[in-house]
């Protein structure tokens, strides 16, 4: 043990010496190093390879080219950079020169292309031909002459001079072996990186030609000039990259005619991206903008434009112009015969892709004859040159038709394979179509230039659209996520994946800009487009820097969260950052620059600011490498960017003081770099600044003294140099000291770098806090949208650099791997788990398992790592954890780190090729890690990685330095950051407590101490944040790697490039290679992302799913019969059955949906079609509802206008009445009393209204109170939920950590028990050995005592004992030899057996490998065949769906055709009947017309006679002095006229009778027609039943159509009944008119005209029906179409049968394949069993061998111990013989005493040590037991708490579910109520319409009645006048005749009155007048009259006349107050026009 301790001390001393030598070399100057190198070169054993962390500083630049000579006779081979180490090459890398002689010739074409798959994947086309030029292009030599340029291509000879000391030389290990005789172990060759495609073929293989897309069609538009004077469109000019027919790229100026700012619709017909071609027929492509504007201005009222979309926007324009709104796409047109023939010819030729190393080529697979080709081979013929090749089946892939070249969705490809996808992407990229759907994801190819597909006008083309309606675009992803967020109210996240430089940051900026533009912000404008642009500018300046792969690469990960309110507007926003490369400020790879903000600041044009920052004079050297730009244009651009940055800060509300503080910190970092750091020579190596004047400037800017700054940087470096990490949980208590030997010292430069990185980290954290302050808001947010942008995959080899990747690049690659893993989990694992939960069986045989070996190699933790022990456990751990463990081990280096890493994850013996995620590199301290499932191999350089675990005290001192600053501006920054952090944390405490805990605003604010475990924690927080939302993935692919092939852009040209600048600068290298695409690189990215598997799963699976209840609620509108059957609120016990009924009614294809246990699943696109049908149905219902609403509103408006008109008329009449009665006494009394009554009524009403208002107010207050209480309860519950969630998270984390600690303690306890058992075993062995030694010692003592006694007694006895002893020794020797011989014989036999077993094992291993290779080939073939079979199945399902749709259309067409036939037949029969009726009615009408004409003539004559008679009567009445003869003549004429009138009345009665007879005949004919119609309907019903029996599939549809027909028939019958009622009313009125006197004949004529009009209308209808009736030719055409459709249907049925036969064949093939597969699996299982048996036997043999070896070793050890014992005994025996004579008595006592004492002392020491160890182990065991018990109790308490929280969460979830269900029921009741209200409104509208028609009829009748009454009034007035005139002439008996005639007229009137119905006021008035006439007649009928009576007669006649005319006047005059109270006067005169007329006459 002491020896082991001594060896450990020696080893530690050796390590310490090496360490001191290394530090001594680091302290050496450059001159000393050069001299040491020259000395070592002279001695021949130089092997200098310093790889310090400041390697870039020790390397020197090449100032002049090195003259290299070529030896005569030697050949020079300049090959690619990716050649192996055994080939001659020249590698120049950042000042390094590596030379290697070509040892082997390059043999074969295959050997010339051996290299890294990454370099080959980054190439486009063939390999670079001019390698020397490529090598030279990677450097910018400061001086280059024309003479020296020729020397760059030479190589040094073997005997050339030593290299120049200005150049650091790295020689290969082979040359080192030659130069030195030392046995330096040469590292093993670099492992081969697995390649994607390696095969080449002996033919000219070319990629398919890029077929240019057909140019978009030109559109001609004619725009009218608007009232504002313009045409409503804007003119925009720009430059575009285009390709000439010869293939050259050039720029041209184009003009766009786009909709104006105020035009948001398609009224103009223009869309964004329309290129202006012609104006008014003149081409304007080559005209200037002024000329075009002048041409538009000179146009008249209209202008004709011809426009054409640009290729980038052709898809968007097509999809937008298909409909008026662009929200729905039209179905594609049917294919023509030519297209179908072309596709058939394509598929018959069996086109395939031949996959080779450079890409793929199009070929035709030839049908080989039997046995002409070996198995697994096919024969193909290349299309471009006709070469015929025999290739493997795995080298060909199915090709799609040319129509699939530019599909928008890769999931629509018929054959889904890598080559087809690459071909589609290549063709789309060549057509400037950068976006492509890949199932649910989006694939974006980063453009080399700036495409014109991103603008605000293009954004509005996506607003409000569904995903199915949008062309692939980054805006489509944003719209899809935004729409999903609004519909589901769930958080959404958009994750961008891809390599560095692939356009992720640009795409994320477009996403945020779209959301900010379309969603808008609330009233406070907390987040606008201007603020987002300012934020992007700020992040780009402080977080981006140029790299070898990207001109402005993002160097941090960020999550931009947009919070939305209830209205879908942005309420607030926040930015979270992590994984910032803060060390890039001071240290970064060669040829890369620092953050952009430093170059912007150094180019600042503000002299005042430069003076304040001391930047007027810049330093020549800067240890941080921060140098100003040299080119004037770069300086100008950087100055512009600085001004833009200042403007952005103002927009983000960053005050000038805060801006100034930022500039002060940045300038101080620059001055620190200029100051530098060194060790003072005369101050015992004290660290200090190299240039104190620059350090003084930095101290002044930071507000501290130079001593304080120096102390913060240099004087406390040992504080963190002890590997002390507060955030790491591996630190033991014994490692916390600050001793010199427990940690490594930090150099002065490292301390300075730590301060710079700390300052920049604090500044960046402060800026994020200020940004969040500007974006915060107090509004309540409902859900959020997160955009995740992380740095892409970093691979320096893709950028043309030979350096190894750094640790920061490893972190970024690790984050990308984690995001890729998240994509795989979301796409594959979650979907499969969902299918498994719902019991849906889907076979994904070709789906490879998801592997995350690269992730595990970085972050895999172990339980042993939690134990505070330095002992290495056998459990594998990741690189980050190994770094921390190795940092704790004294003397650990990067080499030991790599050894441990490769022992866990490196390739092991027996592993298959390509399974290991790690490979060794030929360079020292380098390794390769395979990212993206082994498709992206990155070489990492681990030099200096152990320093990342050291805690830099300067970094920790940076915040304290800012806090203690004397500058007030700088001092307030930390306090502001703390205040902002507290405000933000309080604002987001409710919803984002967990996120804030794990993912703060900036990762640097977690802790200022650095630990590698924080990298994993930050990425975990990022993943956890994303997992809580619904994810949308965008895959950004890199089309061509930056700098390969060709020259990479210099870092200086990219330092000031802004990501926001989209215009391509002139001279960009991408112009020469417009839209180039590297197929190999794209294949690597495509295979690494596993997009093909995702698309295949998307196609084969059921990506869309919906819960049963939600599906029924959403789509029951498509099945109204189910709604009528069950009602809208129906609740069924079996939801699944209800959904099945709904699916059956929807008539979906069976393969398009699948029923699960709780939800229904749909194929891709099925749910979208259902949504489209639902939208159409909803639109139809809404249209009808809107029409009903508008009709109702119009009717209400019309009714209101009628009421207003009536009110106006009433008011006017009342005013007139008021003028007449205002002076009457009763009216004055009325006007005095009426207001008093109204006042009382109004007071009562006001009191009632006040009470009602008070009640409503109380109710409102109560509702508001309840609402506030509910809101408070809701907020309290939300707060409680968030607190419980956070507590649950904390408890869960605590439980996880406790379980980890418990597991760790358990493992440690087991390990301790194991060690204790081993020690116990050793103790027992030692104890046995000690007992055996004791026995031997005792025997020796006894023998010695016996010998001594024997010598005393007898000398002969000693000889006897000696002989016995010698004999025993000989026997022992013989026994040992015999045992040794037997052991050797057994060993030989065992070795022979082992060799046989090894040979057998080798044979079996070879057989197993061969079987594995065959199995892998069969698996690949099976997977390929399965994929092709799945593609065929999907294609077949698509065809079946299409056939199903065609069958549905055919059935619908058949039903419509049969219905048309029935309608035609019915119309024909009705036409014939109506024609017969028409003829009869025409004849009757003609006869009636003739009769009416005759009567009209007679009436006209009579009218003339009446007029003449009236004239004569007038003359007679005016001439009172006429004689009796003329009076007699008049009387005679009067009697004649009366007779004629009687005759006319009789004739009119006869005509009325004839008209009545005609009406009866017409009614009879109508009844006959009705009976015939009923008979015909019965016949048709029988025919319908026959048709239903013949067409069972159409029975449901026909019943619906019959129901509609019956409803129409009932409506028609109802109309006919109404018509008959009107006709009966008309006949009744005609009878009434015929019974009137001759004055009412006009009414008869009107009725006759109306009858004629009705007949004319009937004639017109008959003519219309006759003209519209289909002809026989049309019926024949319909029959032909029917026959053609039946023939088509039969053909479709045949095709379907043929497809079914093919399906059966395919099923048979599948069965054969399955059988073969099962046979192979059985064979494989049999081989596996044999292998297992052999392996078991080998293990048993190995165990036996081990036992034998153990026995052999034990025997050898025992023999050696026996020999040693025998030698000791022999020596003791000799010694005792010599001393026997001298000290016999004294020797025995002393010897026994000494030996006893020595033995007893040794035993006590051993026992004491063992007992101490046992006590120590028992103590540790008791402590571990107590710890275990404590942790178990803690775990039990945590479990109880978790169970309680789970129960509370379940209860709350149940309550929420109940509330949701109640809400759903209320919503359904509300919908039902709305539907009932709409039904009532419809019924009310129908009733109002009928009422309106009746009112119109009533008004017409009343008007006719009024006209008749007016005629009667006029007649009676004339009679009165005639009576008054005749009274003076009645002196003879002739008066009696006149009186008799008047009496007869009165009698006739009385008769006619009795016949009339109704008793109006006018009739009573007429009756009064008739009574007056009767009284007059009675007075004048006396037998004798005296002459004295004449005067009385004359005097009394007028009085009686006026009394008869105005009988009511006297009453009114007698009692005016009573007349006021009459309803007739007080009320009816306002509503009844007749009464008003009567009152007018009465008042008059």
From Swiss-Prot:
CDD domains: MYSc_Myo18, PDZ_MYO18-like. The keyword Magnesium does not apply. Disulfide bonds: none annotated. Residues 1049-1060 have a biased composition (Low complexity). GO terms for molecular function: actin filament binding; ADP binding; ATP binding; cytoskeletal motor activity. Residues 1-17, 23-34, 2035-2044 have a biased composition (Basic and acidic residues). Residues 988-998 have a biased composition (Basic residues). It is found in: Golgi apparatus; Golgi apparatus, trans-Golgi network; Golgi outpost; Cytoplasm, Cytoskeleton, Microtubule organizing center. The modification Phosphothreonine is found at residues 79, 99, 2035. PROSITE patterns: IQ (PS50096), MYOSIN_MOTOR (PS51456), PDZ (PS50106), SH3_LIKE (PS51844). Residues 1239-1959 form a coiled coil. The myosin motor domain binds ADP and ATP but has no intrinsic ATPase activity. Mediates ADP-dependent binding to actin. This is Unconventional myosin-XVIIIa. The gene is Myo18a.
């Amino acid at each position: 043990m002491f020896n082991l301790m001594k060896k450990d001390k020696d080893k530690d001393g050796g390590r310490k010496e090496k360490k001191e030598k290394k530090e001594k070399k680091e302290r050496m100057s450059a001159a000393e190093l050069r001299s040491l190198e020259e000395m070592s070169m002279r001695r021949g054993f130089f092997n200098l390879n310093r790889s310090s962390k400041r390697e870039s500083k020790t390397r020197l630049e090449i100032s002049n080219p090195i003259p290299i000579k070529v030896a005569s006779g030697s050949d020079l081979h300049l090959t690619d950079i990716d050649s192996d180490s055994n080939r001659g090459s020249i590698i120049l890398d950042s000042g390094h020169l590596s030379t290697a002689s070509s040892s082997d010739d390059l043999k074969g074409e295959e050997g010339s292309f051996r290299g890294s798959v990454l370099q080959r994947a980054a190439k486009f086309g063939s390999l670079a031909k001019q390698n020397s030029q490529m090598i030279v292009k990677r450097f910018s030599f400061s001086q280059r002459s024309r003479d020296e340029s020729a020397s760059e291509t030479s190589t040094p000879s073997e005997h050339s001079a030593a290299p120049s000391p200005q150049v650091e030389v790295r020689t290969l290990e082979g040359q080192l072996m030659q130069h030195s005789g030392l046995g330096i172990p040469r590292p093993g060759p670099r492992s081969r990186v697995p390649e994607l495609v390696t095969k080449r073929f002996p033919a000219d293989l070319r990629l398919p030609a890029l077929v240019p897309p057909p140019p978009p069609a030109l559109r001609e538009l004619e725009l009218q000039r608007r009232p504002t004077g313009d045409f409503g469109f804007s003119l925009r000019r720009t430059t575009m990259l285009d390709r000439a027919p010869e293939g050259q790229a050039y720029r041209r100026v184009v003009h766009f005619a786009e909709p104006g700012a105020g035009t948001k619709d398609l009224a103009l017909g223009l869309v964004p991206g329309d290129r202006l071609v012609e104006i008014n027929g003149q081409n304007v492509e080559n005209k200037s903008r002024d000329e075009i504007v002048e041409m538009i201005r000179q146009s008249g009222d209209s202008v004709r434009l011809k426009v054409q979309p640009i290729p980038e926007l052709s898809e968007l324009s097509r999809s937008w112009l298909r409909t008026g709104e662009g929200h729905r796409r039209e179905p594609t047109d049917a294919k023509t015969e030519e297209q179908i023939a072309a596709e058939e010819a394509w598929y018959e030729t069996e086109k395939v892709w031949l996959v080779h190393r450079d890409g793929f080529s199009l070929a035709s697979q030839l049908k080989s004859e039997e046995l002409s080709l070996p198995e697994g081979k096919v024969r193909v013929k290349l299309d471009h040159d006709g070469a015929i090749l025999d290739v493997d089946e795995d080298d060909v892939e199915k090709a799609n038709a040319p129509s699939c070249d530019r599909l928008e969705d890769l999931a629509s490809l018929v054959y889904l394979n890598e080559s087809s996808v690459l071909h589609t992407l290549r063709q789309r990229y060549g057509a400037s179509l950068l976006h492509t759907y890949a199932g649910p994801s989006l694939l974006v190819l980063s453009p080399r230039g700036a495409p014109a597909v991103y603008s605000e006008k293009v954004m509005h083309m996506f607003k409000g659209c569904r995903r199915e309606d949008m062309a692939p675009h980054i805006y489509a992803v944003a719209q899809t996520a935004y729409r999903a967020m609004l519909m589901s109210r769930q958080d959404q996240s958009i994750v961008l994946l891809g390599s560095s430089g692939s356009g992720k940051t640009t795409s994320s900026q477009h996403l945020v800009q779209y959301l900010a533009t379309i969603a808008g912000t609330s009233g406070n404008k907390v987040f606008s487009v201007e603020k987002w642009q300012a934020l992007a500018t700020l992040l780009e300046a402080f977080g981006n820097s140029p790299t070898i792969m990207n001109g402005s690469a993002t160097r941090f990960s960020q999550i931009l969260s947009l919070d939305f309110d209830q209205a879908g507007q942005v309420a607030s926003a926040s930015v979270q950052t992590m994984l910032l490369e803060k060390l890039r400020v001071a240290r970064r790879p060669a040829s890369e620059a620092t953050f952009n903000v430093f170059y912007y600041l150094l180019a600042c044009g503000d002299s005042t600011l430069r003076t304040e920052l001391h930047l007027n004079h810049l330093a020549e050297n800067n240890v941080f490498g921060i140098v100003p730009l040299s080119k004037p244009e770069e300086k100008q651009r950087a100055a512009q960017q600085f001004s833009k940055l200042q403007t952005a800060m103002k927009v983000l509300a960053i005050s000038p003081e805060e801006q100034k503080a930022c500039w002060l910190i940045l300038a101080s970092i620059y001055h620190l770099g200029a100051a530098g750091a060194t060790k003072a020579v005369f101050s015992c190596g004290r660290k200090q600044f190299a240039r104190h004047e620059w350090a003084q400037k930095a101290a002044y800017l930071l507000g501290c003294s130079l001593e304080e700054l120096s102390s913060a940087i240099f004087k406390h470096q040992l504080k963190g140099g002890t590997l002390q990490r507060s955030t790491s949980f591996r630190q033991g208590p014994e490692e916390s000291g600050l001793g010199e030997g427990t940690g490594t010292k930090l150099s002065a430069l490292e301390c300075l770098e730590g301060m710079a990185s700390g300052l920049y980290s604090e500044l960046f954290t402060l800026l994020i806090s200020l940004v969040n302050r500007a974006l915060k808001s107090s509004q309540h947010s409902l859900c959020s949208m997160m955009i995740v942008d992380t740095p892409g995959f970093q691979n320096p080899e893709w950028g043309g650099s030979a350096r190894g990747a750094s640790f920061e690049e490893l972190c970024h690659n690790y984050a990308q791997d984690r995001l890729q893993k998240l994509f795989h989990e979301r796409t594959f694992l979650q979907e499969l788990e969902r299918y498994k939960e719902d019991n849906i069986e889907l076979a994904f045989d070709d789906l490879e398992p998801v592997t995350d070996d690269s992730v595990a190699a970085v972050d895999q933790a172990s339980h042993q790592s939690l134990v505070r022990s330095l002992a290495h456990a056998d459990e594998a751990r990741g690189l980050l954890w190994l770094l921390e463990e190795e940092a704790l081990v004294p003397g650990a280096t990067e080499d030991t780190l790599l050894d441990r890493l490769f022992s866990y994850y490196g390739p092991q013996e027996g592993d298959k090729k390509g399974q290991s995620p790690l490979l060794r590199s030929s360079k020292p301290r380098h390794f390769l890690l395979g990212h993206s499932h082994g498709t992206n191999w990155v070489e990492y350089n681990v030099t200096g990685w152990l320093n990342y675990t050291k805690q830099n005290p300067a970094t920790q001192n940076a915040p304290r330095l800012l806090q203690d600053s004397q500058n007030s501006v700088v001092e307030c920054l930390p306090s502001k950051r703390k205040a902002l952090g507290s405000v933000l944390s309080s604002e987001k405490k409710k919803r984002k407590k967990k996120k804030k805990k794990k993912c703060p605003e900036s990762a640097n604010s977690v802790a200022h101490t650095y630990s590698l475990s924080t990298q994993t924690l930050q990425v975990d927080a990022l993943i956890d944040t994303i997992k809580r939302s619904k994810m949308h993935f965008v895959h950004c692919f890199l089309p061509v790697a930056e700098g390969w092939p060709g020259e990479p852009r210099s870092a200086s040209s990219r330092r000031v490039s802004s990501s926001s600048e989209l215009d391509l600068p002139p001279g960009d290298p991408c112009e020469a290679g417009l839209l180039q695409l590297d197929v190999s690189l794209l294949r690597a990215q495509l295979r690494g992302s596993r997009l093909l598997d995702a698309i295949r799963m998307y196609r084969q699976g059921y990506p869309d799913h919906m819960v049963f209840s939600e599906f029924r609620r959403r789509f029951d509108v498509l099945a109204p019969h189910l709604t009528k059957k069950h009602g809208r609120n129906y609740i069924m016990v079996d939801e699944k059955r209800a959904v099945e009924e709904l699916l059956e009614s929807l008539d979906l294809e069976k393969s398009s949906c699948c029923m699960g246990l709780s939800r229904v699943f749909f194929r891709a696109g099925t749910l979208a079609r259902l949504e489209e049908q639902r939208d159409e149905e909803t639109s139809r219902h809404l249209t009808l509802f809107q029409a009903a609403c508008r009709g109702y509103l119009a009717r209400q408006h019309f009714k209101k206008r009628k009421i207003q008109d009536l009110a106006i008329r009433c008011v006017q009449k009342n005013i007139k009445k008021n003028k007449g009665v205002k002076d009457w006494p009763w009216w004055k009394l009325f006007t005095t009393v009426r207001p008093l009554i109204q006042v009382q009524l109004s007071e009562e009403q006001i009191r009632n209204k006040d009470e009602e208002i008070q009640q409503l107010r109380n109710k409102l207050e109560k509702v508001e109170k309840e609402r506030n209480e509910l809101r408070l309860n809701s907020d309290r519950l939300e707060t409680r939920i968030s607190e419980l969630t956070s507590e649950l998270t904390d408890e869960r984390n605590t439980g996880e950590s406790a379980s980890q600690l418990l597991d760790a303690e358990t493992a440690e306890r087991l390990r301790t028990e194991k060690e204790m058992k081993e020690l116990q075993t050793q103790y027992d062995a030692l104890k046995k050995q000690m007992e055996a030694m004791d026995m031997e010692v005792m025997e020796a003592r006894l023998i010695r005592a016996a010998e001594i006694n024997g010598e005393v007694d007898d000398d002969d006895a000693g000889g006897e004992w000696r002989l016995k002893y010698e004999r025993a020794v000989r026997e022992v020797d013989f026994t040992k030899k015999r045992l040794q011989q037997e052991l050797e014989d057994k060993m030989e036999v065992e070795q022979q057996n082992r060799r046989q077993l090894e040979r057998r094992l080798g044979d079996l291993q070879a057989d197993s490998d061969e079987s594995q290779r065959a199995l892998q080939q069969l698996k690949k073939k099976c997977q390929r065949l399965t994929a092709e079979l799945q593609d065929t199945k999907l294609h077949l399902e698509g065809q079946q769906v299409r056939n199903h749709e065609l069958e549905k259309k055919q059935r619908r067409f058949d039903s419509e055709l049969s219905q048309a036939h029935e309608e035609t037949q019915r119309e024909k029969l009705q036409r014939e009947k109506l024609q017969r009726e028409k003829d009869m009615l025409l004849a009757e009408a003609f006869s009636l017309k003739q009769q009416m004409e005759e009567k009209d003539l007679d009436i006209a004559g009579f009218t003339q006679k009446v007029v003449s008679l009236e004239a004569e009567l007038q003359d007679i009445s005016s001439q009172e002095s006429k004689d009796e003869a003329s009076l007699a003549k008049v009387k005679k004429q009067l009697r004649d006229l009366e007779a004629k009138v009687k005759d006319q009345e009789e004739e009119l009665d006869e005509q009325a009778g004839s008209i009545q007879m005609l009406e009866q005949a017409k009614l009879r004919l109508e009844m006959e027609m009705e009976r015939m119609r009923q008979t015909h309907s019965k016949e048709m019903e029988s025919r319908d039943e026959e048709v239903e029996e013949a067409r069972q599939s159409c029975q449901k549809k026909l019943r619906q159509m019959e129901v509609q027909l019956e409803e129409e028939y009932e409506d028609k019958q109802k109309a006919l009944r109404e018509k008959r009622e009107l006709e009966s009313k008309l006949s009744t009125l005609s009878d009434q008119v015929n019974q009137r006197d001759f004055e009412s004949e006009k009414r008869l004529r009107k009725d006759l005209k109306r009858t004629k009009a009705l007949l004319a209308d009937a004639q017109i209808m008959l003519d219309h029906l006759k003209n519209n009736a289909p002809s026989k030719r049309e019926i024949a055409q319909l029959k032909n179409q029917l026959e053609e459709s039946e023939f088509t249907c039969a053909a479709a049925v045949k095709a379907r049968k043929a497809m079914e036969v093919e399906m059966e064949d395919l099923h048979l093939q599948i069965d054969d394949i399955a059988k073969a597969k099962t046979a192979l699996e059985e064979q494989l299982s049999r081989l596996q069993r044999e292998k297992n048996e052999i392996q078991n036997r080998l293990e048993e043999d190995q165990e036996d061998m081990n036992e034998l070896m153990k026995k052999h070793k034990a025997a050898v050890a025992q023999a050696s111990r026996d020999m040693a014992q025998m030698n000791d005994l022999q020596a003791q025996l000799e010694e005792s013989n010599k001393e026997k004579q001298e000290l016999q008595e004294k020797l025995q006592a002393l010897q026994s005493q000494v030996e006893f004492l020595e033995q007893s002392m040794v035993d006590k020491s051993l026992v004491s040590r063992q007992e101490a160890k046992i006590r120590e182990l028992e103590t540790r065991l008791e402590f571990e037991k107590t710890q275990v018990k404590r942790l178990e109790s803690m775990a039990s308490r945590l479990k109880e708490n978790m169970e309680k929280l789970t129960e509370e969460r379940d209860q709350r979830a149940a309550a929420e579910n109940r509330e949701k269900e109640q809400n759903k029921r209320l919503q359904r009741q509300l919908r039902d109520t709305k539907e009932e209200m709409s039904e009532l409104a419809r019924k009310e509208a129908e009733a109002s319409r009928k009422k309106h028609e009746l009112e119109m009829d009533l008004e017409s009748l009343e008007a006719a009645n009024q006209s008749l009454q007016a005629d009667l009034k006029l007649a009676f007035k004339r009679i009165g006048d005639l009576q008054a005139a005749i009274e003076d002439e009645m002196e003879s008996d002739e008066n009696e005749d006149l009186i008799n005639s008047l009496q007869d007229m009165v009698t006739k009137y009385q008769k006619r009155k009795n016949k009339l119905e109704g008793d109006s006021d006018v009739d009573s008035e007429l009756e009064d007048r008739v009574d007056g006439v009767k009284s007059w007649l009675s007075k004048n009928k006396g037998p004798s009259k005296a002459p004295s009576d004449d005067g009385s007669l004359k005097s009394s006649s007028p009085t009686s006349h006026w009394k008869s005319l105005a009988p009511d006047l006297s009453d009114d005059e007698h009692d005016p107050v009573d007349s006021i109270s009459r309803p007739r006067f007080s009320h009816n005169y306002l509503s009844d026009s007749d009464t008003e007329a009567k009152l007018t006459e009465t008042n008059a």
